[in-house]
């Protein structure tokens, strides 16, 4: 089940939990989404500042599996 987190500190606490398995980082042109998979919930944090996103990426726990996903350009047909 998905849950959205608004605070960076709260996200880091969730990422350091024992049941946190992996983090997916989705980069879009307007924002960066961090998704941490825990046993019960998938916690999502949306950051619009690219510098804060890089700092958060560096402060993730080292034992956690991190996967980066870049956005695709959507094809708009007239």
UniProtKB/Swiss-Prot annotation:
Keywords: Ribonucleoprotein, Ribosomal protein. InterPro entries: Ribosomal_eL38, Ribosomal_eL38_sf. One of its GO terms (biological process) is protein-RNA complex assembly. One of its GO terms (cellular component) is cytosolic large ribosomal subunit. The gene is RpL38. It comes from the Eukaryota. This is Large ribosomal subunit protein eL38. The keyword Ribonucleoprotein applies. GO terms for molecular function: structural constituent of ribosome. Gene3D superfamilies: 3.30.720.90.
